[in-house]
């Protein structure tokens, strides 16, 4: 038992130093930290203790061979030279975990196959039975590590990964591994014997790990399946001694100072069952509660609050998360004065929404996500004012005050005007302040924040934080519910991505615009269904269309068609390449009671349809994209380059006294007057007449022209 052997404990990156300390405490081992784990020297009892007691190690490996190889032949020769009969019986199943590559062995599956071949061939040459490979639960697991020419072959004494404690039946959404939960608790600064609160406990892993620490329950006490069970070097007597010592160290005389809260009663039920399985159900108080109503369960004691709040990988979840973290920060100040707080998040910028100053921070990985854990000390003074109001907390922690003040000012001006104009959809803010490069639009009782893509010179994290601040301030100023705020990142459109779905919520509602009802969808597409800056253009087109035949080319969702039809157009024709948007246009017609044979919809490449058109129209509205290279179009389209080609075709189908309303959003667009004259057309720039009050800050957002035959 006194023979000293060097083992290797693997760990997630960033855990190594704490694992070294833990191993010293468990078995007195002298450890050496390397990336991905700790080499530690101990006897066999110490190895068993490490397997049973470690909360941070992923696996414990017993190295068999360490050598240099250059090819798969070297690998095979090394494996077949190992005396496998001294390690396991050929009647036992085995499996090979192969990690790493080099110039010759470029695939881990190939490497694992060569190791497997070497082991099988060894036994067959010794005239033993051929051992069977079992991927799911092998008796023996061989671990192979290859880094360039360095090869290490080890016996995995763990069997299954050590984060699998056995108490979790259902992990729910986005679970924390038990090893990660343990290190979060250890890094939080929590002291045994003091209260520990998790206000968003989910499946309860943080609290269960801490409660087991407090109760002296070793993490692997319930495990039956081990990687050493079939190992010929296993010493059952020593193992039994280690087990008995582990059982004897349980502490049953401890106070139940663990508190778990969660809004979801189903998740809470799973947490309770997990705690029961882990043997700590009697130590943890569970309660269904909303974070907005979070109360300190131990006002007469100082303790630690630790949590892993939800975080979304999709940007669309951000407004709700910002509100969650903001309210969370307020409740911490109100209820947990003098406490230690430790929050772990996969979206580090959300931690800034807590409006707390951290004392320490730690990086960690949760699967592929780069995460951050921040520790805070809540100021003592707040405990003397437990009845501080939420509004005063919000005022004291107001974010982006310049942005908030400008938004408030704009709302007072624009909403009064919008009410007079019978408008439900309008712009409230349009990058008024350079450092807050956003647009804020109201659609009835919803708000859409469009972030203009930041230039490359702006640090991504800084732009992201300003975006979060803007969302927080907008929620505060407008008072809307978080589920009615939509966040979008506006980038340069490439090809057809204006038609691509961003989500699939299917949430439509209609807005009023000068008496027209128009369906909008704020989440599923890059655009919402109406272009707000063209509002006056649509109104003007409607007034011009009375008693006329009307063509809406590049019709989008048909909003201009609705205005034309409501104002008494004789007949309307709407053409767009997107079937999605034409269906939308059809729904708009139906919503306004306009569905009839006089209002036709065509799904087609607009330019191709135009070339084949034999009808003539008295009023044509054309609002083409700035650029398009859609696969559904025969050629690419550039409005600056191709607008005369477009006018050539439009003139052919325009009646002698007809008019074309031509608009586009290309900044710096230059009308080719000579080209128009050669066609017998003349253009009048009416852009200034079509710019509504809420877009006055950006007079170049679109340009608009009325084009006629010269003789008219």
Curated annotation (Swiss-Prot):
Cross-referenced Pfam families: Methyltrans_SAM, RlmL_1st, THUMP, UPF0020
Record's GO cellular component terms: cytoplasm
CDD domains: AdoMet_MTases, THUMP_AdoMetMT
Catalytic activity: guanosine(2445) in 23S rRNA + S-adenosyl-L-methionine = N(2)-methylguanosine(2445) in 23S rRNA + S-adenosyl-L-homocysteine + H(+); guanosine(2069) in 23S rRNA + S-adenosyl-L-methionine = N(2)-methylguanosine(2069) in 23S rRNA + S-adenosyl-L-homocysteine + H(+)
GO molecular function: 23S rRNA (guanine(2445)-N(2))-methyltransferase activity; RNA binding; rRNA (guanine-N7-)-methyltransferase activity
SMART domains: THUMP (SM00981)
Chain ranges of the THUMP domain: 46-157
SUPFAM superfamilies, A to Z: S-adenosyl-L-methionine-dependent methyltransferases
Main location (coarse class): cytoplasm
Keywords in alphabetical order: Cytoplasm, Methyltransferase, RNA-binding, rRNA processing, S-adenosyl-L-methionine, Transferase
Enzyme class, broadest EC rank: transferase
InterPro entries for this protein: 23SrRNA_methyltr_KL (IPR017244), DNA_methylase_N6_adenine_CS (IPR002052), RlmKL-like_Mtase (IPR000241), RlmKL-like_Mtase_CS (IPR053943), RlmL_1st (IPR054170), SAM-dep_methyl-trfase (IPR019614), SAM-dependent_MTases_sf (IPR029063), THUMP_dom (IPR004114)
Enzyme nomenclature, EC number: 2.1.1.173, 2.1.1.264
Record's subcellular location: Cytoplasm
Family classification: Belongs to the methyltransferase superfamily. RlmKL family.
PANTHER family to which the protein is assigned, alphabetical: RIBOSOMAL RNA LARGE SUBUNIT METHYLTRANSFERASE K/L (PTHR47313), RIBOSOMAL RNA LARGE SUBUNIT METHYLTRANSFERASE K_L (PTHR47313:SF1)
Function: Specifically methylates the guanine in position 2445 (m2G2445) and the guanine in position 2069 (m7G2069) of 23S rRNA.
UniProt xrefs under NCBIfam families: PRK11783.1
HAMAP family from the UniProt entry: 23SrRNA_methyltr_KL
Protein name: Ribosomal RNA large subunit methyltransferase K/L
Organism: Haemophilus ducreyi (strain 35000HP / ATCC 700724)
The encoding gene: rlmL
């Amino acid at each position: 038992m006194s023979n000293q052997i060097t083992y290797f404990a693997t760990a997630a990156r960033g855990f190594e130093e704490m694992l070294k300390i833990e191993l010293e405490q468990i078995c007195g081992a002298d450890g050496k930290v390397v990336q991905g784990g700790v080499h530690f020297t101990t006897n066999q009892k110490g190895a068993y203790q490490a397997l049973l007691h470690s909360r941070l190690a992923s696996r414990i490996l017993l190295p068999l061979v360490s050598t240099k190889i250059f090819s798969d032949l070297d690998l095979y020769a090394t494996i077949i030279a190992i005396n496998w009969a001294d390690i396991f019986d050929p009647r036992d199943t085995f499996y090979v975990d192969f990690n790493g590559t080099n110039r010759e062995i470029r695939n881990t599956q190939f490497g694992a196959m060569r190791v497997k071949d070497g082991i099988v061939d060894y036994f067959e040459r010794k005239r033993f039975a051929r051992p069977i490979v079992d991927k799911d639960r092998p008796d023996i697991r061989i671990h192979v590590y290859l880094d360039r020419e360095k090869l290490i072959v080890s016996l995995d004494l763990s069997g299954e990964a050590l984060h699998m404690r056995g108490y979790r039946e259902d992990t729910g959404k986005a679970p924390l591994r038990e090893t990660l939960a343990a290190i979060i608790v250890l890094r939080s600064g929590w002291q045994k014997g003091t209260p520990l609160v998790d206000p968003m406990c989910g499946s309860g892993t943080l609290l269960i790990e801490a409660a087991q620490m407090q109760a002296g329950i070793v993490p692997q006490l319930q495990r039956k399946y081990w990687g050493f069970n079939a190992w010929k070097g296993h010493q059952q007597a020593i193992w039994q001694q280690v087990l008995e010592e582990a059982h004897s160290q349980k502490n049953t005389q401890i106070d139940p100072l663990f508190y778990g809260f969660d809004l979801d009663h189903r998740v809470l039920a799973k947490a309770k069952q997990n705690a029961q399985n882990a043997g700590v159900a009697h130590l943890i108080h569970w309660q269904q509660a909303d974070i907005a109503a979070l109360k300190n369960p131990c006002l007469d004691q100082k303790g630690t609050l630790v949590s892993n709040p939800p975080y979304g990988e999709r940007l669309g979840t951000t407004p709700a998360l910002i509100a969650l973290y903001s309210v969370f920060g307020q409740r911490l100040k109100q209820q947990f004065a003098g406490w230690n707080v430790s929050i772990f998040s996969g979206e580090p910028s959300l931690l800034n929404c807590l409006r707390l100053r951290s004392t320490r921070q730690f990086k960690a990985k949760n699967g592929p996500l780069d995460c951050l854990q921040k520790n805070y000390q809540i100021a003592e003074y707040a405990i003397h004012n437990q009845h501080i109001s939420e509004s005063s907390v919000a005022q004291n922690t107001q974010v982006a005050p310049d942005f908030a003040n400008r938004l408030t000012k704009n709302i007072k001006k624009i909403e009064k005007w919008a009410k007079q104009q019978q408008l439900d959809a309008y712009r409230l803010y349009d990058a008024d302040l350079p450092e807050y490069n956003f647009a804020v639009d109201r659609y009835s009782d919803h708000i859409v924040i469009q972030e203009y893509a930041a230039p490359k010179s702006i640090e991504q994290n800084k732009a992201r934080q300003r975006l979060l601040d803007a969302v927080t301030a907008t929620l505060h100023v407008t008072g809307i519910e978080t589920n009615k705020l939509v966040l979008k990142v506006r980038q340069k459109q490439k090809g057809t991505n204006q038609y691509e779905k961003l989500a699939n919520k299917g949430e439509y509602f209609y807005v009023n615009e000068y008496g027209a009802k128009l369906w909008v969808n704020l989440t599923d597409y890059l655009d919402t269904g109406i272009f707000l800056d063209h509002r006056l253009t649509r109104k003007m087109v409607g007034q011009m269309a009375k008693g006329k035949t009307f063509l809406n080319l590049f019709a989008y969702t048909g909003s201009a068609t609705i205005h034309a039809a409501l104002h008494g157009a004789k007949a309307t024709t709407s053409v767009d390449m997107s079937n999605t948007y034409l269906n939308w246009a059809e729904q708009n017609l139906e919503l306004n009671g306009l569905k009839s044979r006089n209002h036709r919809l065509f799904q087609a490449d607009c330019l191709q349809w135009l070339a084949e058109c034999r009808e003539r129209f008295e009023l044509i509205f054309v609002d083409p994209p700035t650029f398009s290279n859609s696969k559904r179009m025969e050629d690419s389209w550039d409005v600056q380059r191709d607008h005369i080609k477009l006018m050539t075709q439009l003139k052919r189908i325009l009646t002698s006294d007809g008019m074309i309303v031509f608009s586009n959003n290309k900044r710096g667009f230059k009308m080719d007057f000579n080209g128009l004259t050669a066609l017998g057309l003349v253009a009048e720039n009416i852009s200034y007449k079509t710019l509504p009050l809420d877009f006055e800050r950006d007079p170049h957002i679109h340009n608009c022209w009325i084009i006629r035959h010269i003789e008219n």
